[in-house]
């Protein structure tokens, strides 16, 4: 299981952060779990009014993330699912999404939580979606990582806090 060795992140004083969640629509059951996990994590962190936007698929996540990064968000969470099929499409989409979201983060300085599952099978995706019986909750993890990074960046840019 890939979740072994995950850090326990302590995130405090982040209720005032402006956070957006962007979620793809492919693989509805998996996406419902990822979105629920993300919203639960935000609520646990005291961020009760996040922006939630839906896009057609994972490939559309980077362009929306880039626009949101330029509109004053402190953190963005990108959620999607890409499941391997019988053609190279999986590799192209997975690489494009990964590089695109990384570029948004590096270019803008706004953390983007990477909650895009790239799996060989639907069963692997369901096991990571945070649903009842899942072993992992990648939506929750992506929020925690993005918000923790935003909180860290706040201390770097505002040392008086």
From Swiss-Prot:
Disulfide bonds: none annotated. It holds the Pfam family DMRL_synthase. InterPro entries: LS (IPR034964), LS/RS (IPR002180), LS/RS_sf (IPR036467). Its EC number is 2.5.1.78. SUPFAM superfamilies: Lumazine synthase. The active site is at residue 89. Belongs to the DMRL synthase family. This is 6,7-dimethyl-8-ribityllumazine synthase. It comes from Streptomyces griseus subsp. griseus (strain JCM 4626 / CBS 651.72 / NBRC 13350 / KCC S-0626 / ISP 5235).
């Amino acid at each position: 299981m890939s979740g072994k060795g995950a850090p326990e992140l302590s995130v405090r004083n982040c209720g005032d952060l402006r956070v957006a969640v962007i979620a793809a629509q492919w693989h509805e059951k998996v996406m419902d779990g990822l979105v629920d996990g993300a919203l639960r994590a935000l609520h646990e962190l005291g961020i009760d009014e996040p922006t939630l936007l839906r896009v057609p698929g994972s490939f559309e996540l980077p362009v929306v993330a880039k626009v949101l990064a330029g509109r004053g968000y402190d953190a963005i969470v990108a959620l999607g699912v890409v499941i391997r099929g019988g053609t190279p499409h999986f590799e192209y989409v997975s690489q494009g999404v990964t590089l695109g979201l990384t570029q948004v983060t590096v270019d803008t300085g706004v953390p983007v939580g990477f909650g895009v599952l790239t799996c060989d099978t639907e069963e692997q995706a369901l096991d990571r979606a945070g649903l009842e019986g899942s072993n992992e909750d990648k939506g929750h993890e992506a929020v925690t990582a993005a918000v923790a990074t935003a909180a860290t960046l706040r201390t770097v840019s505002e040392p008086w806090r």
